[in-house]
């Protein structure tokens, strides 16, 4: 057992306990979804600033028509009018 690789040991455990397959599948699905959501937050959120020199306040560049929420149930962003001053 000392010379076996990690993949071989993993395969043996899966072969002995097939009930682990759905659990491993759901764990991988959850980790993948969490990773994709973090990537979406990092790239699309107006609160995240990757370039402080050229864009120190990215939230001031948003127009009222920009939808940055993940899900907007009752708000139609295309009909909103601009009611804030430009900075």
Curated annotation (Swiss-Prot):
UniProt superkingdom: Eukaryota
InterPro entries the UniProt entry points to: B12D (IPR010530)
Pfam families given in the database record: B12D (PF06522)
Residues of the signal peptide: none
Coiled-coil blocks: none
Classification via PANTHER family: NADH DEHYDROGENASE [UBIQUINONE] 1 ALPHA SUBCOMPLEX SUBUNIT 4-LIKE 2, NADH-UBIQUINONE OXIDOREDUCTASE MLRQ SUBUNIT
Family according to the record: Belongs to the complex I NDUFA4 subunit family.
Name listed for the protein in its UniProt record: NADH dehydrogenase [ubiquinone] 1 alpha subcomplex subunit 4-like 2
Gene that encodes it: Ndufa4l2
